[in-house]
């Protein structure tokens, strides 16, 4: 059987770079969550382009963002805000990525758990988040060029340890 009969491998030659890019984008998304939970604001900021846009929608139904930050340096206060919690855990769920050369767009679902202490009371705030992302690959590395943090709902409840 010749290679013409089995396929020339062209499909695989096209598929492998796409798989590599998709994996790199997923690792970027997961690195953002990891840095958030480890309180590594500098590491989190390094995942963004210098000219990034970061928009926060505390109510995803509202067309106007609650916050709009421009530039990597502007992100520090938002990421430092996580220090008001004694612990966080971001669980990334399903995600999509649409590749277009060195650009991509995608959506990632996340359940973000935030533990807070107020005196002797502990509370857990869970936020259902959708990230609407635009990515760019520079010098072989993927970055966020825009990230929209869309809060679909939150729940806050006492946290009881047993």
Tell where the protein language model's regions lie, with residue ranges:
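Short, low-complexity N-terminal intrinsically disordered segments enriched in polar/charged residues
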Residues: 1-50
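Aromatic-acidic/polar surface patches that form glycan- and anion
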Residues: 21, 25, 37, 68, ...
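A solvent-exposed, acidic/Ser-Thr-rich amphipathic alpha-helical stretch
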Residues: 41-111
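Alpha-helical elements of Rossmann-like donor-binding domains used by nucleotide-donor carbohydrate transfer enzymes
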Residues: 31, 74-77, 130
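Generic signal for short, ordered secondary-structure residues
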Residues: 11, 22-23, 54, 76, ...
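Short secondary-structure boundary micro-motifs
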Residues: 16-19, 51, 79-82, 117-120
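A beta-strand edge to alpha-helix "cap/lid" segment located at domain peripheries
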Residues: 2-13, 84-162
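Charge-dense, low-complexity intrinsically disordered segments
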Residues: 15, 19, 65-69, 122
């Amino acid at each position: 059987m010749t290679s013409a009969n089995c396929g020339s491998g062209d499909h695989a030659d096209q598929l492998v770079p796409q798989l590599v890019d998709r994996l790199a984008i997923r690792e970027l998304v997961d690195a953002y969550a990891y840095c958030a939970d480890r309180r590594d604001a500098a590491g989190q900021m390094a995942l963004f382009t210098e000219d990034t846009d970061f928009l926060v929608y505390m109510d995803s139904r509202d067309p106007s963002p609650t916050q709009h930050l421009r530039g990597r340096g502007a992100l520090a206060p938002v990421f430092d805000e996580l220090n008001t919690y004694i612990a966080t855990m971001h669980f990334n769920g399903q995600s999509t990525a649409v590749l277009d050369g060195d650009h991509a767009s995608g959506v990632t679902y996340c359940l973000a758990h935030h533990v807070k202490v107020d005196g002797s009371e502990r509370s857990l705030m869970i936020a259902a988040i959708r990230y609407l992302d635009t990515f760019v690959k520079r010098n072989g590395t993927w970055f966020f060029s825009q990230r929209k943090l869309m809060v679909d709902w939150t729940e806050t409840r006492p946290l009881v340890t047993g």
